[in-house]
């Protein structure tokens, strides 16, 4: 006989470990265990059978994989946590004894840890880090807009804001912005970096009330990890673009208007990126080839001629037949006779339509418009920005320079006011939404709908469902509404005519119906007598007739509702589904039906509104 198997030595009981057991095994506090799990990406698991995993107990506990906890035993950060625990005891003892000098020495040599090796473990390739960049950006932008409180220091907020501005400066310089959406929560942006779509949310800079039930220890742990990750990513991106990281900050501009203009991006050669960018744009717009001198052209033609003669001699030596067929060689004309120049078209650095959308425009942004949003968006699309706030600061600090400025080159003025009293000739006045909608569509939309004081068209999310309700389909809706109105009018006229005919023929039909009812009663009485003579009940005959009628109705319904080949294939697929798949399919169909009903409801409301507007115009 084999040995009796011991309890809780295999299966769920061995594969899973509770949080209390894990803390005892690692010999750390609960707070350090949470930090370690966040850094390493280890999260609780749900076993199939909790009772077996907990060795027969049904108490609610948190489980982890035993292999994950065993993996944490060799983590260098865990050793630093233990060193910090010892350091805290020594520091407390020194302060208790009043040994200030020894306490200062201990504080200077406090154990420090880095998360660089963890970043390399969790993200072995650069694309893996880019794919997981959405949450870090959202967390950093959240903290950058938060006020300083007891649990969140000013330094943490300043560091988060600096990292966020480094990111925005890179995206705007490389013109990587593709889509954006202004929502209630904030502004959503999407950039494409090395083929990976990165989407993040920037909250509005409003006064915020911080809730008391938020555990900032966990959030700060995530922030620490995300800051390290974003530093890695930015260092790689800046280096690949030939830029110095971190970029230089212009303190004077930062104190004045601030914004992205205060972050000066410099190449590794020591040149300002703005000058290089201008040269690249000029080169992209006017592509010219390299001109060859006359001496170089003569040498090239002579070498070509000598090579041609040498080829003909070699061909003549190879021919052994007495008669040689003469062939006419192609004559290559010299392109320099027409003063032509060899050109080599260079690929443009900014290939997407949004990268050069505003490259020919200079925008003047009023003080009532959020500068941080529009500055980033316009610079990311190749435009230039002049803000009213910076002009006011320049007027106060340097009046001579302000007087020498030429503002005639401004093409667009962005304003969020109903009326503009003094308009400058030559400028196009628009509302901020014109910029956002142009970016989402990838082309310049009509300016007329976005003039100051006009009712703006709906600002839709570029990530919405394609089959959902589209309020912009105005022309299509109005055309359909007109067709339906005509059809409804025709149907109403036909119904009125039919009612008149029915009223006219009503008296004649009443007499016929009375006669038919009398005949039916006579037939029923005769059948009852026949059934009594035969010894059968009349109710059995009646039930049989009703059953035959129902069968006929079912046959007619089945013939009317003949299934198409696609519907038949769907029905066959449903038969082959499992119960789980059928439930999931029903849920999907319910969601699709709900969505279509919602779209139909909204389109119906839209048609009614269009009809009312049309009636008001006619009046």
From Swiss-Prot:
Species of origin: Lodderomyces elongisporus (strain ATCC 11503 / CBS 2605 / JCM 1781 / NBRC 1676 / NRRL YB-4239) (Yeast)
Q: How does it assemble?
A: Component of the NOP7 complex, composed of ERB1, NOP7 and YTM1. The complex is held together by ERB1, which interacts with NOP7 via its N-terminal domain and with YTM1 via a high-affinity interaction between the seven-bladed beta-propeller domains of the 2 proteins. The NOP7 complex associates with the 66S pre-ribosome.
Which residue windows are coiled coil? 472-560, 588-619
Q: What InterPro entries does this protein's entry cite?
A: BRCT_dom (IPR001357), BRCT_dom_sf (IPR036420), PES (IPR010613)
Renumbered to this chain, region (Disordered) spans 303-324, 456-567
Q: Where is the composition biased (Basic and acidic residues)?
A: 523-539
What is the gene called?
NOP7
Chief localisation class: nucleus
Taken from the UniProt entry, a GO cellular component term is: preribosome, large subunit precursor
Family annotation (Pfam families): BRCT_2, Pescadillo_N
> What's this protein's family per the entry?
Belongs to the pescadillo family.
What name does UniProt use for this protein?
Pescadillo homolog
Domain BRCT residue range list: 353-452
- SMART domains, per the entry: BRCT (SM00292)
Where is the sequence biased in composition, kind Acidic residues? Answer: 312-324, 480-522
PROSITE patterns listed in its UniProt record: BRCT (PS50172)
Q: Which PANTHER family match?
A: PESCADILLO - RELATED, PESCADILLO HOMOLOG
Q: Which GO terms describe its biological process?
A: maturation of 5.8S rRNA from tricistronic rRNA transcript (SSU-rRNA, 5.8S rRNA, LSU-rRNA); maturation of LSU-rRNA from tricistronic rRNA transcript (SSU-rRNA, 5.8S rRNA, LSU-rRNA); maturation of SSU-rRNA from tricistronic rRNA transcript (SSU-rRNA, 5.8S rRNA, LSU-rRNA)
């Amino acid at each position: 006989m084999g040995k009796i198997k011991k309890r809780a030595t295999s299966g769920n009981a061995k594969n899973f470990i509770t949080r209390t057991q894990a803390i005892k095994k690692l010999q750390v506090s609960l707070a350090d265990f949470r930090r370690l799990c966040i850094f390493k990406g280890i999260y609780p698991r749900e076993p199939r059978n909790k009772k077996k995993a907990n060795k027969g107990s049904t108490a609610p506990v948190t489980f982890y994989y035993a292999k994950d906890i065993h993996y944490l035993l060799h983590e260098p950060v865990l050793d630093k946590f233990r060193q910090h625990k010892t350091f805290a005891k020594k520091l407390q003892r020194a302060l208790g004894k009043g040994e200030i000098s020894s306490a200062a020495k201990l504080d200077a040599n406090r154990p420090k840890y880095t998360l660089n090796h963890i970043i390399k473990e969790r993200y072995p390739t650069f694309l893996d880090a880019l794919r997981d960049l959405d949450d870090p950006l959202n967390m950093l932008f959240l903290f950058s807009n938060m006020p300083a409180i007891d649990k969140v220091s000013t330094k943490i907020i300043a560091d988060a804001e600096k990292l966020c501005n480094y990111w925005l400066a890179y995206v705007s310089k490389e013109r990587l912005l593709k889509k954006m959406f202004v929502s209630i929560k904030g502004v959503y942006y999407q950039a494409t970096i090395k083929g990976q779509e990165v989407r993040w949310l920037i909250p509005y800079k409003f006064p915020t009330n911080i809730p008391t039930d938020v555990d900032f220890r966990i959030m700060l742990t995530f922030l620490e990890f995300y800051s390290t990750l974003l530093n890695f990513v930015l260092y790689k991106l800046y280096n690949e673009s030939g830029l110095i990281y971190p970029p230089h900050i212009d303190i004077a501009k930062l104190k004045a208007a601030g914004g992205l203009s205060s972050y000066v991006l410099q190449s590794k050669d020591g040149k300002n990126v703005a000058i290089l960018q201008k040269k690249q744009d000029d080169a992209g717009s006017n592509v010219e080839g390299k001109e060859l001198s006359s001496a170089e052209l003569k040498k090239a033609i002579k070498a070509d001629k000598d090579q041609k003669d040498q080829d003909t001699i070699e061909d003549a030596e190879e021919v052994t037949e007495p008669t040689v067929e003469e062939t006419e060689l192609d004559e290559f004309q010299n392109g320099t006779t027409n003063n032509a120049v060899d050109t080599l078209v260079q690929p443009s650095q900014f290939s997407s339509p949004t990268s050069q959308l505003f490259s020919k425009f200079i925008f003047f942004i009023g003080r009532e418009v959020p500068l941080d949003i529009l500055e980033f968006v316009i610079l990311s699309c190749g435009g230039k920005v002049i803000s009213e706030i910076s002009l006011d600061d320049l007027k106060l600090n340097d009046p001579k320079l302000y007087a020498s400025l030429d503002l005639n080159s401004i093409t667009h003025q962005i304003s969020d006011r109903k009326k503009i009293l003094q308009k400058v000739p030559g400028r196009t006045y628009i509302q901020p939404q014109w910029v956002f909608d142009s970016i989402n569509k990838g082309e310049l939309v009509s300016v007329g709908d976005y003039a100051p004081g006009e009712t703006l068209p709906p600002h839709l999310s570029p990530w919405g469902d394609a089959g959902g309700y589209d309020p912009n389909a105005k022309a299509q809706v109005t055309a359909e509404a007109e067709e339906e109105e005509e059809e409804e009018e025709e149907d109403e006229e036909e119904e009125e005519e039919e009612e008149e005919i029915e009223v006219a023929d009503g008296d004649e039909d009443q007499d016929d119906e009375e006669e038919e009812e009398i005949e039916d009663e006579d037939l029923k009485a005769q059948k009852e007598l026949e059934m009594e003579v035969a010894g059968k009940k009349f109710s059995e005959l009646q039930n049989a007739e009703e059953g035959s009628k129902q069968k006929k109705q079912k046959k007619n319904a089945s013939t009317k509702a003949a299934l198409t080949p696609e519907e038949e294939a769907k029905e066959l697929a449903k038969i082959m589904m499992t119960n789980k798949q059928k439930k999931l399919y029903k849920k999907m169909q319910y969601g699709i039906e709900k969505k279509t009903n919602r779209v139909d409801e909204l389109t119906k409301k839209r048609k009614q509104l269009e009809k009312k507007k049309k009636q008001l115009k006619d009046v």
